[in-house]
Amino acid sequence: MDLQSLLAARVAADKPVRVGLIGAGKFGSMFLAQVPSIAGLDVAVIADLDPDRAKAACRSVGWDTARVARTRFAERGRDACLDERVEVIVEATGDPAAGIANAIEAIEAKKHTVMVNVEADALAGAFLARKARAANVIYSMAYGDQPALIAEMVDWARAAGFSVAAAGKGTKYLPAYHTVTPNAVWEHYGLSADEAKRAGMNAQMFNSFLDGTKSAIEMAAVANACRLDVPHDGLGFPSCGADDLASVLCPRPLGGVLAADGMVEVVSSIRRDGKPVERDLRWGVYVVFKARNDHAAACFKQYGLPTDATGRYAAMYKPYHLIGLELSISVLNVALRGEPTGSCRAWRGDAVAVAKRALKAGEMLDGEGGYTVYAKLIPAERSLALGALPIGLAHRVKLLRNVAAGEFVTAADVALDDNLRAVRIRREMETQARQMTQVLTAEQGAASSVFLQHSDVTRG
């Protein structure tokens, strides 16, 4: 990896990597803070619903007057996508429908796309990645966010000749968190509502981190990028610290918690009694890998890696991730090396809506981190069989029937707007998946999982 030399060549040629940023929120602002320190990287356009807020964000992260003045500010993502100077689009709105629309606009304009918007990727990454490949541009996860870091670790393990047993991240989790609502979220962060307000923290967004929704979305993205499996009935969130990864995240017959090798999972930084886990990974990412031969297993021991009881499972981890401060790694990879930092390759997992409480017909769902639903990660084939409603479509939609607490919300339970592009794309994905499953089953006697793993329709 020699991005610095490749970028220096661009500087020498007076051909900087020019970026269009859509969404100047927290993630985008962290990226903007680093741009002045990276010679050869230039943000030519910033699109935000509030351009004045975007300008203020630039000033707040240290941009000087001259840099702000030479940057184009716009209200529409389309303006960034169509700007002829732009080579890479960074989609950082956080809105699934907007993210899908912006990514399509960028791809059709022959721009590489770095998708910070993991909500959009979990909803329609297979469609977007396939469309990008057809257009001969790159569709990439965003480095700095946990899914891309996990994908990098999985790739490292496989390229080194190991098999991957598990990959994922850490978080703070208790089962009761699934039903927490925004009006009670701050007590779990040790903050008062006033403190959170002064810090500009959004209650619903931070609640999505707590109630399991963000974990489900991110692990769906990881499973789909790395062709890993997901638990049948949602993430287990085992309590586990860095030193115990290999012994906890191995198959059940070996004393671990996994149904099998090759799974995504999220570990909790606290035990079920609320006590902290030693050397927790609340902010980190990990991969558990398996030696394929006795010699490699012996080397684990010789070099001091903590392993499971068999000595064949070991782990690597990063204790932290730097979010937007690391985003330039993705931008430079796609522009200078023509490579994504993780990209959807299959449709293996789906983050779907589950009722937080008894819901009544006529109520409006309020999406991730809200008062009505949280997301559970399940296999894509199970989601298709249930007709489950993806969490990315569970915002501002009306319930047509009652749904009991803890039950899946299905697409038939809500009034989806067929005029929305995101709805049409999702339905197209589902229809193609069902049709191809039927073909494979009829022709090969194959299980639907064969399609979900290998077909061009779902590889994205």
Stretches with model-predicted labels:
Residues 1-105:
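N-terminal glycine-/serine-/threonine-rich beta1-alpha1-beta2 phosphate-ribose binding loop
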Residues 2-8, 188, 192-443:
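C-terminal catalytic/substrate-binding lobe primarily of soluble NAD(P)-dependent oxidoreductases
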Residues 45, 89-91, 113-116, 139-142:
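Short catalytic-loop micro-motif centered on adjacent basic/acidic residues
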Residues 49, 94, 118-121, 144-145, ...:
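Short, ordered loop/turn segments at secondary-structure junctions
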Residues 88, 95, 106-123:
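ADP-ribose/adenylate-binding Rossmann-like module
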Residues 100-105, 118-137, 142-145:
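Rossmann-fold NAD(P)-binding glycine/threonine-rich loop
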Residues 140-210:
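Rossmann-like NAD(P)H-binding beta-loop-alpha module
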Residues 444-459:
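Intrinsic disorder/low-complexity segments
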